[in-house]
């Protein structure tokens, strides 16, 4: 009886006592308060449908590819991004990645699910969603994979199977953020292996931030070589320029 009362009290407290907005710090019942939601999310930027690079124009206009994707299409087929990697949204990615603010993974995942409902209309249905894998050493050090923290709620909302072990990181590479852009592709070129059958599948790949695109490029190439029919990237934030 006492245990049940404790559970009820905990649920009541969670519902009744406000948290703080992850951006402004004001009291809020949601991870992002309504004010910050309106100010920083729901952007209308037109993006390249292949790599999510921002383009001139507004969302809803004709779907043009950026010059790089038009000239040399990457191995992935589409990329969805919530917003640019810029202040103050960049702090959310950093808090998730380095400060174990795992509620932000759910926030990113659920927002990506809403975006996907419209953006992927008419595309082949997703068969499985998987995170960009971390090297074992880094996973042990951090204790979690921030991409998986996004992938699980995304898959749950889209009612798609999630698989944390679909791909494996077989090379413990240097952090991409420490390398010049031209060195990033070589750094991750042979970093991944496919651990489950993917032949004929539409695979959704999840990461927190897309910068040069080298990591997602390498993983998509590995998936395609293993027979994946289509690869769609889901990223919380996208740097404005490669």
Annotate each predicted stretch with a short phrase.
Residues 1-207, 211-242:
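Glycine-rich phosphate/pyrophosphate-handling loop used in enzymes and phosphotransfer proteins
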């Amino acid at each position: 009886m006492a245990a049940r009362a404790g559970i009820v009290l905990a649920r009541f407290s969670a519902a009744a006592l406000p948290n703080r907005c992850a951006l402004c710090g004001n009291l809020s019942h949601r991870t992002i308060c309504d004010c910050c939601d309106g100010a920083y999310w729901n952007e209308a930027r037109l993006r390249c449908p292949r790599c999510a690079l921002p383009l001139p124009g507004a969302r809803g206009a004709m779907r043009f590819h950026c010059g790089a994707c038009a000239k040399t299409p990457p191995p992935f087929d589409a990329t969805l991004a919530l917003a640019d990697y810029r202040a103050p949204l960049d702090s959310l990615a950093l808090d998730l990645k380095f400060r174990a603010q795992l509620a932000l993974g759910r926030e990113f995942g659920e927002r990506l699910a809403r975006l996907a409902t419209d953006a992927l209309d008419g595309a082949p249905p997703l068969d499985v969603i998987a995170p960009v894998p971390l090297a074992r050493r880094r996973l042990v050090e951090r204790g979690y994979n921030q991409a998986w923290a996004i992938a699980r709620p995304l898959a749950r909302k889209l009612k798609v199977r999630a698989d944390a072990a679909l791909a494996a990181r077989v090379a413990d590479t240097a952090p991409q953020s420490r390398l010049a852009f031209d060195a990033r592709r070589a750094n991750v070129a042979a970093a991944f292996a496919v651990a489950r059958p993917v032949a004929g599948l539409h695979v959704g790949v999840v990461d927190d931030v897309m910068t040069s695109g080298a990591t997602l490029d390498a993983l998509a190439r590995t998936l395609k070589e293993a027979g994946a029919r289509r690869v769609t990237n889901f990223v919380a934030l996208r740097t404005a320029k490669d």
